[in-house]
């Protein structure tokens, strides 16, 4: 029986090292008291700062984009007119959803919302912005390059920060799940 207790301690130590590495203070220590639903939420402050600035910058970007589109609309071929109007609508909807998912995922430490924020940023918003910046057929104006460049810079900074925040939230929730199993006697 003593040998089984030693094996159990070794396995417990191993699982703590695997699942609770880099979790730090966000996971409460095993104290014998039942784990309640109230736990410490650790949002990424740097991601929140960039989301805050992005939320204020986005209306300015939208107004500049509409003004620049109106100024050069007569100079563009028909297919570019269609593409730019569709891009304006798509990017506006995606950006609003992306910012909402970023705020709720980061502040409430919700992994699906934070993952959705990362996916929308990488798979949709970044390629659309790079198209607006790099396609010479759009005849970009200097103001247009500047506002698209700033929004792209925000996006390129937010992507790695959000990936780290997602990893941190996932580890935190995995640690809580592991602790719940320990406290219930199932693990």
Swiss-Prot record:
<keyword id="KW-1003">Cell membrane</keyword>
<dbReference type="GO" id="GO:0060170">
    <property type="term" value="C:ciliary membrane"/>
</dbReference>
<comment type="similarity">
    <text>Belongs to the TMEM17 family.</text>
</comment>
<keyword id="KW-0472">Membrane</keyword>
<feature type="transmembrane region" description="Helical">
    <location>
        <begin position="82"/>
        <end position="102"/>
    </location>
</feature>
<keyword id="KW-0812">Transmembrane</keyword>
<dbReference type="GO" id="GO:0007224">
    <property type="term" value="P:smoothened signaling pathway"/>
</dbReference>
<keyword id="KW-0966">Cell projection</keyword>
<dbReference type="GO" id="GO:0036038">
    <property type="term" value="C:MKS complex"/>
</dbReference>
<keyword id="KW-0969">Cilium</keyword>
<dbReference type="Pfam" id="PF09799">
    <property type="entry name" value="Transmemb_17"/>
</dbReference>
<protein>
    <recommendedName>
        <fullName>Transmembrane protein 17A</fullName>
    </recommendedName>
</protein>
<dbReference type="GO" id="GO:0060271">
    <property type="term" value="P:cilium assembly"/>
</dbReference>
<keyword id="KW-1133">Transmembrane helix</keyword>
<comment type="subunit">
    <text>Part of the tectonic-like complex (also named B9 complex).</text>
</comment>
<feature type="transmembrane region" description="Helical">
    <location>
        <begin position="114"/>
        <end position="134"/>
    </location>
</feature>
<dbReference type="GO" id="GO:0035869">
    <property type="term" value="C:ciliary transition zone"/>
</dbReference>
<feature type="transmembrane region" description="Helical">
    <location>
        <begin position="146"/>
        <end position="166"/>
    </location>
</feature>
<comment type="function">
    <text>Transmembrane component of the tectonic-like complex, a complex localized at the transition zone of primary cilia and acting as a barrier that prevents diffusion of transmembrane proteins between the cilia and plasma membranes. Required for ciliogenesis and sonic hedgehog/SHH signaling.</text>
</comment>
<feature type="transmembrane region" description="Helical">
    <location>
        <begin position="49"/>
        <end position="69"/>
    </location>
</feature>
<dbReference type="InterPro" id="IPR019184">
    <property type="entry name" value="Uncharacterised_TM-17"/>
</dbReference>
<keyword id="KW-0970">Cilium biogenesis/degradation</keyword>
